[in-house]
């Protein structure tokens, strides 16, 4: 484990930066959706508790289908999606929760709002999975085979540590802004877009590094 962390810190700081990007994504967007959607569906849309729980189950199903779709797209179009475009994926993924914030801001029919939330959740998870696949593939290509398992374990450890922190944070935030939950979603997507913009140069450099490694091979 020490060898893998030394490799990440000293030899390939790009891998550390990639890990921190995934962490930031989990902290800002994933945690917001994981905490916010159950609150919205079960408490803010006026459904009976049993109905609300069932409808949230459908939302989780849509998110799972989105993840599966993102995985399939990532497998089919892996060579066509460039790592330099990952910043764009991040930005679009962040914007995919904009409809959720909007339906909470306007007095739309409940079923219409629910369908929009479901579609947005599907798209967000599809793009998030696609982003994760592309970034993890890139990080694997930058890692020697002898360290691959250890380095990927470190990356997953770093990236997953942010999720419980984000959940605790959003638990408090949604409680404080319980009457205006759309504010939380607007804030999360804004930060997500900023993160995406700030990573444009990083992903371009990663693309160049990958080409350099491939040429050397």
Where are these regions (language model features)?
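C-terminal transmembrane bundle of multi-pass solute transporters/carriers
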Residues: 42-217
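Hydrophobic residues in alpha-helical segments
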Residues: 1, 8-10, 130, 142
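A single, central transmembrane helix in multi-pass transporters
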Residues: 6-69
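Hydrophobic alpha-helical segments of integral membrane proteins
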Residues: 1-8, 147, 173
């Amino acid at each position: 484990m020490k060898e893998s962390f030394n490799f990440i810190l000293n030899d390939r700081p790009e891998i550390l930066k990639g890990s921190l990007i995934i962490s930031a994504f989990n902290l800002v967007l994933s945690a917001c959706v994981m905490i916010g959607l159950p609150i919205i569906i079960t408490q803010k849309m006026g459904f009976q508790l049993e109905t609300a729980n069932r409808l949230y189950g459908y939302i989780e199903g849509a998110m799972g289908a989105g993840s599966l779709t993102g995985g399939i797209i990532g497998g089919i179009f892996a060579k066509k999606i460039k790592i330099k475009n990952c910043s764009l994926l991040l930005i679009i993924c962040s914007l995919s929760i904009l409809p959720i914030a909007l339906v909470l801001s306007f007095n739309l029919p409940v079923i219409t709002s629910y369908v929009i939330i479901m579609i947005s959740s599907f798209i967000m998870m599809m793009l998030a999975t696609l982003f994760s696949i592309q970034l993890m593939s890139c990080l694997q290509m930058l890692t020697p085979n002898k360290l691959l398992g250890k380095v990927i374990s470190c990356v997953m450890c770093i990236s997953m540590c942010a999720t419980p922190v984000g959940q605790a944070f959003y638990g408090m935030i949604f409680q404080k802004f319980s009457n205006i939950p759309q504010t939380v979603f607007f804030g999360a997507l804004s930060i997500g877009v900023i993160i995406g913009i700030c990573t444009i140069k990083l992903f371009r450099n990663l693309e160049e590094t990958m080409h350099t490694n491939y040429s050397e091979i």
